[in-house]
């Protein structure tokens, strides 16, 4: 069995790790970074860019770049236009996953086909399925989807086998937030509860700074930058840097020269100071939202802050002092610092991958479903079948009946959420069980079964116990993709892979041809009388042919003209080398003649005489 890659597919950055020698190891990307920006873009030439190179071009080419796509995964109608083509969040995420896969293969020297991917604990069914679809599009078999806080606890608790620990994992990433409470003991990791917000993260903190800068600039210059894409991208980058700097210093300066120009063409600049106090004031409501989730998680787990043994902070945004202090003051304990908040989730994913591959032993992960799942019943009521924070995998059944006499069919409306009214919850899917024999209302027995697998993905079955007729569905919700769509996207991804390969081949072919032209021209200059006039003319003609080919788009013509020039140059280069050897040999013989007589005949071993010698000091 090959390596199984553990992937933290993050909103802002992604990270990957594998088990090597029984221990999790973070794999650097092709650029040498231990995390990869979750950014995708296309250059002005149409080349696909992923990671750091895509992030670098966002300021100059914001219309052909996308970041934080994770915030939209699972949204069925959402698409982003890049280089004139619409892409779903799954396709964009697949590009990021594909880069991670390719970089891991280059680092490990072996093919990677399987993965464990992490998601926020509060991701719903459609978001989980969409993440799994993204992996499939990227050419990866997703063996398991696990929750990010759970993965972080695996990273923390791998070597802590003695005694029971109750830990609170506070995960504030780039675009999502959740908090989970787990119990660790004897290699068993059991999730007791989870709560959170899939649309709250570091991006929102950055946005508050961006809005502040836009407003301050408008006051000073009377110019609104909110509709200037290029300026906004520069502001967003500056806001992120300011947020990071304010984690370590009391104030920072945002200086952006030539941010725009006024109506007279006069350039305008931004030069604004931001204090940590200002930043904390503009983001205090965001921090407060996370407190409510912590309270809910504790309540669901039937615990108090005194029951928590350890606090783990995950995600780069937890470095913000206001966040750190909130958690510390609420729980009454200093958060555990011996864990890298940017890498812990990927390390945990690698550990779970190691469990699946048999490389890691004596670890059992008991995760939970974050939201209640049920169906709509008479009167628009949401009837739960599986309550939130139920350990998964889980399978539960309940008997329902018809609402009207002689009702021939029933619609199963599948819901996810905590509201008692069906319309207030999220619809995961619908299907119809028909063929019910005529009978008075309440008499037919319809058994509805909910089955949540180890990835947290739901499968529903409805069966008429009287006739044995049944209907089932693996939820293909608004954010999910059909098998046909996934297959099309896989082929599309493969097509792009071929395009990328072809583009790379073209660049290398042209570079080789250019280098050869330069080398051939130098050879002509240095050849002198070694090359005949005919050979020189042949090389000059071959150079001209190759230059003409390089001006066109025919790659095969470039290759053939390159080969022709190589052949012409080779003959002259060989003659030049032979001449150089002769000159070197003649020089060596002249040197020997000058130093004394030498034997002109060949000597056999019998003619060789071993001589004693004595060193003579001529100064004596």
From Swiss-Prot:
Keywords, alphabetical: ATP-binding, Chaperone, Nucleotide-binding
Keyword Coiled coil: no
Region annotation (Disordered) ranges: 579-620
Record-linked InterPro entries: ATPase_NBD, Chaperone_DnaK, Heat_shock_70_CS, HSP70_C_sf, HSP70_peptide-bd_sf, Hsp_70_fam
Top-level taxon: Archaea
Low complexity bias: start-end ranges: 583-603
One GO MF term attached to the UniProt entry: unfolded protein binding
Acidic residues: bias regions: 604-620
Biological role stated in the UniProt entry: Acts as a chaperone.
Family, as annotated: Belongs to the heat shock protein 70 family.
Name recorded for this polypeptide: Chaperone protein DnaK
Gene source species: Methanococcoides burtonii (strain DSM 6242 / NBRC 107633 / OCM 468 / ACE-M)
Gene: dnaK
């Amino acid at each position: 069995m090959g390596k199984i890659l553990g992937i933290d597919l993050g909103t802002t950055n992604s990270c990957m790790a594998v088990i090597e020698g029984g221990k999790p190891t973070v794999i650097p990307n092709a650029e040498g970074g231990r995390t990869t920006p979750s950014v995708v873009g296309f250059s002005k030439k149409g080349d696909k860019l992923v990671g750091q190179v895509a992030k670098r071009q966002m300021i100059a080419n914001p219309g052909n770049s996308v970041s934080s796509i994770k915030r939209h995964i699972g949204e069925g109608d959402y698409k982003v236009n890049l280089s004139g083509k619409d892409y779903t969040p799954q396709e964009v995420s697949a590009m990021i996953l594909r880069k991670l896969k390719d970089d891991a293969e280059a680092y490990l020297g072996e093919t990677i086909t399987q993965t464990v991917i992490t998601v926020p604990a509060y991701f719903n069914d459609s978001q989980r399925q969409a993440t799994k679809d993204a992996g499939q599009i990227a050419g990866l078999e997703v063996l398991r989807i696990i929750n990010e806080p759970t993965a972080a606890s695996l990273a923390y608790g791998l070597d802590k086998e003695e005694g029971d620990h109750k830990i609170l994992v506070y995960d504030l990433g780039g675009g999502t937030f959740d908090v989970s409470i787990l119990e660790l003991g004897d290699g068993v990791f059991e999730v007791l509860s989870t709560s959170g917000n899939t649309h709250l993260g570091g991006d929102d903190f950055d946005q508050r700074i961006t809005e502040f800068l836009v407003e301050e600039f408008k006051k000073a210059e009377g110019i609104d930058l909110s509709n200037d894409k290029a300026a906004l991208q520069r502001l967003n980058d500056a806001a992120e840097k300011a947020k990071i700097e304010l984690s370590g210093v009391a104030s920072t300066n945002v200086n952006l020269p030539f941010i725009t120009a006024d109506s007279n063409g006069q350039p305008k600049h931004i030069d604004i100071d931001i204090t940590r106090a200002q930043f904390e004031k503009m983001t205090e409501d965001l921090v407060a939202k996370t407190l409510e989730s912590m309270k809910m998680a504790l309540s669901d787990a039937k615990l108090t802050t005194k029951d928590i043994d350890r606090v783990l902070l995950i995600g780069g945004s937890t470095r913000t002092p206001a966040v750190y202090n909130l958690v510390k003051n609420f729980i009454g304990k200093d958060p555990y610092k011996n864990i890298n908040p940017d890498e812990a989730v990927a390390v945990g994913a690698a550990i779970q991958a190691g469990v699946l591959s048999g490389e890691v032993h004596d670890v059992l992960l008991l995760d939970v479903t974050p939201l209640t799942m049920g169906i709509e019943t008479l009167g628009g009521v949401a009837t739960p079948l599986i309550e939130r924070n139920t350990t998964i995998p889980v399978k539960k059944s309940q008997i329902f009946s018809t609402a009207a006499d002689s009702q021939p069919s029933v619609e199963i409306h599948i819901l996810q959420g905590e509201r008692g009214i069906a319309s207030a919850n999220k619809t995961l899917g619908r299907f119809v069980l028909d063929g019910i024999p005529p009978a008075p209302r309440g008499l037919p027995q319809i058994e509805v079964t909910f089955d949540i697998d180890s990835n947290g993905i739901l499968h529903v079955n409805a069966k008429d116990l009287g006739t044995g007729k049944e209907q089932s569905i693996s939820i293909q919700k608004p954010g999910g993709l059909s098998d046909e769509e996934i297959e099309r996207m896989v082929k599309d991804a493969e097509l792009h892979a071929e395009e990328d390969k072809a583009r790379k081949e073209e660049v290398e072919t042209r570079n080789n041809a250019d280098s050869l032209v330069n080398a051939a021209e130098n050879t002509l200059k240095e050849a002198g009388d070694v090359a005949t006039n005919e050979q020189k003319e042949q090389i000059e003609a071959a150079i001209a042919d190759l230059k003409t080919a390089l001006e066109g788009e025919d790659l095969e013509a470039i290759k053939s003209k390159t080969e022709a020039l190589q052949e012409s140059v080779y003959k002259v280069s060989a003659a030049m080398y032979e001449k150089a050897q002769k000159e070197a040999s003649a020089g060596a013989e002249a040197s020997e003649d000058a130093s004394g007589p030498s034997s002109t005949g060949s000597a056999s071993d019998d003619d060789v005489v071993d001589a004693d010698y004595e060193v003579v000091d001529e100064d004596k």
